[in-house]
């Protein structure tokens, strides 16, 4: 699709160059949209004209007024059932009026620039996907299971899953009037990659991130009282054999569904804090699993956290509540303990525990446009972050599902060698590794740990070193950058937030951290200046080492004391408030 955008002093006029019979008009004063027959005659002053706009994200209101969000580039990443899926690129926010920012106070102007940078950062992350004619928010099973009367004549925006419709609240002006729905283009944060196998078979992996309770690693954990969990992602693997013949297998990941937090405090592993009473936690958990059952059927919980430390308390609280639920099979596999020493071959122990459920749940299979069988249940996998261990296990689960698919139906459709050999191994492992990196970056800021196993099928020393590098990056980002990133998620997913009273985000680290490190360097400098050289005598070595260790220890104590001022925290909302609503 190529859209011409004409920006006048009174309205935006959008013309689909593929269909000039109708044009979309957005009135800047009333913020209402309407359809005009043909290209309207325009006697108004044209401020700007942009050709080849690829889509409209919607209209967002900030302190100074409204902005039209568009994107001007896209990248074709996959084709599913003959319909193309694209990655959104080159986002632009256009103010309704050129001088609208100058009409507000200088502090409000500064705050608005910051809010604009948050929106631009999120939308320009290249993590958003869309399709002009494919309902990207629904799995293939849900698309085929939806009745014709529900979808007949309806636009994409009217039938998609609101959990994955990230710009739903920004296109309301297009959904209120008849005939405007065709301009609605749902965008979804997630991951899409597709490769060809054996010349004709298409292997596609799609992930959709739930916008409810979205955010960053340590700022958003657990569940809210509506049953929404942090880092909630639905992943669908599609094997397309020929036109109208394909299989689909779906699984999900999400934070442990209890009221708990782990806010950053400069500690490598911050303390876990629990919220609410027994009733509140049970109600939230039951609501979550009720939603899972309505969407997918029976649930197998694969809990990968440690049976020691803070993770043990979480695991025990989770196990106690979830075992009383019907249609839920709970498996606690202590990944780190069982697979320590890079013994990832021991993951076969877990797969033996899951094989019966894999057979029972099956997969979705359509042959020549007709439903042959449906997937009857879902695997819900989690670790503490729902990233690294989770991605490793999800890739194994889907591989075993693929083996079942090949044994039961695909062997009649394609050669048995399609899912064997070097080409398949390369495609499968690399797509799942790319997926792990993308989902991890959205939540933690870095690629996934343990991804060398996903990419190559084995752990190696180089992968361990890469994990160390990513762990250091995560520590820095989670403590000193995630406040801004969390505010970006919150601002975009909560357009009703009152920005007139919101506190402006401050860059970190502030002066306390500077003073602390200045003290360390000063102590080291003075030690070198006045104490005997560390190389001249044992006494000199002991003296300098004592000063160095003491300075570092004192600096760390000061840092922990002032961590509230040092850690980059979100400012658009109070962190604790998300556990009270």
From Swiss-Prot:
The gene is sac1. Residues 533-535 are lumenal. GO terms for molecular function: phosphatidylinositol-3-phosphate phosphatase activity; phosphatidylinositol-4-phosphate phosphatase activity. GO terms for biological process: phosphatidylinositol dephosphorylation; response to Gram-positive bacterium. The chain crosses the membrane at residues 512-532, 536-556. It comes from Dictyostelium discoideum (Social amoeba). It is an enzyme of class 3 (hydrolase). This is Phosphatidylinositol-3-phosphatase SAC1. Keywords: Endoplasmic reticulum, Golgi apparatus, Hydrolase, Membrane, Transmembrane, Transmembrane helix. PANTHER family: PHOSPHATIDYLINOSITIDE PHOSPHATASE SAC1, PHOSPHATIDYLINOSITOL-3-PHOSPHATASE SAC1. Residues 1-511, 557-581 are cytoplasmic. It is a multi-pass membrane protein. PROSITE patterns: SAC. The keyword Translocase does not apply.
């Amino acid at each position: 699709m190529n859209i011409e955008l004409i920006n006048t002093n009174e309205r935006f006029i959008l013309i689909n160059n593929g269909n000039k019979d109708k044009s979309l008009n957005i009135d800047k004063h009333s913020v209402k949209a309407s359809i005009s027959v043909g290209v309207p005659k325009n006697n108004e002053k044209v401020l700007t004209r942009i050709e080849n706009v690829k889509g409209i994200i919607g209209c967002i209101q900030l302190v100074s007024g409204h902005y039209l969000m568009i994107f001007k580039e896209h990248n074709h990443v996959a084709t599913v059932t003959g319909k193309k899926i694209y990655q959104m690129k080159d986002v632009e926010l256009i103010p309704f009026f050129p001088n609208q920012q100058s009409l507000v106070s200088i502090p409000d102007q500064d705050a608005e620039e910051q809010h604009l940078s948050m929106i631009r950062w999120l939308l320009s992350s290249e993590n958003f996907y869309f399709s002009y004619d494919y309902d990207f928010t629904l799995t293939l099973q849900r698309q085929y299971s939806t009745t014709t009367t529900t979808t007949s004549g309806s636009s994409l925006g009217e039938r998609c899953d609101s959990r994955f419709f990230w710009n739903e609240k920004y296109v309301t002006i297009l959904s209120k009037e008849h005939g405007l729905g065709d301009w609605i283009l749902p965008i979804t944060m997630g991951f899409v990659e597709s490769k060809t196998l054996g010349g004709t078979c298409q292997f596609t992996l799609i992930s959709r991130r739930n916008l409810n309770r979205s955010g960053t690693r340590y700022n958003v954990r657990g569940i809210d009282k509506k049953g929404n969990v942090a880092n909630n992602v639905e992943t669908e693997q599609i094997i397309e054999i020929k036109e109208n013949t394909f299989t689909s297998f779906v699984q999900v990941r999400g934070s442990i569904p209890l009221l708990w937090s782990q806010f950053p405090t400069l500690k490598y592993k911050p303390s876990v804090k629990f919220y609410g009473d027994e009733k509140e936690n049970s109600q939230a958990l039951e609501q979550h699993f009720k939603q899972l059952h309505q969407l997918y059927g029976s649930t197998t919980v694969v809990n990968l956290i440690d049976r020691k430390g803070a993770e043990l308390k979480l695991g025990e609280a989770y196990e106690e509540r979830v075992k009383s639920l019907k249609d839920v099979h709970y498996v606690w596999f202590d990944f780190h303990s069982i697979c320590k020493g890079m013994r990832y071959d021991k993951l076969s122990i877990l797969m033996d525990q899951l094989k019966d459920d894999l057979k029972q749940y099956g997969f979705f299979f359509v042959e020549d446009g007709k439903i042959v069988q449906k997937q009857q249940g879902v695997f819900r996998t989690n670790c503490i972050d729902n990233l690294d261990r989770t991605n490793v296990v999800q890739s194994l689960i889907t591989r075993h599902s693929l083996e079942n698919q090949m044994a039961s139906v695909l062997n009649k459709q394609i050669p048995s060698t399609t899912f064997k050999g070097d080409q398949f191994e390369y495609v499968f492992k690399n797509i799942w590794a790319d997926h792990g990196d993308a989902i991890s970056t959205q939540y933690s800021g870095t690629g996934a740990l343990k991804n060398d196993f996903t990419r190559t099928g084995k752990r190696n020393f180089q992968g361990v070193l890469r994990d160390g590098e990513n762990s250091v990056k995560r520590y820095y980002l989670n403590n000193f950058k995630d406040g801004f990133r969390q505010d970006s998620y919150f601002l975009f997913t909560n357009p009703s937030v009152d920005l007139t009273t919101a506190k402006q985000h401050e860059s970190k680290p502030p002066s306390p951290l500077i003073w602390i490190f200045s003290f360390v360097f000063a102590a080291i400098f003075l030690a070198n200046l006045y104490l005997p050289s560390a190389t001249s005598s044992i006494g000199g070595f002991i003296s300098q080492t004592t000063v160095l260790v003491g300075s570092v220890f004192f600096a760390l104590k000061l840092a922990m004391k002032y961590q509230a001022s040092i850690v980059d925290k979100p400012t658009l909302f109070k962190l604790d408030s998300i556990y009270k609503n």
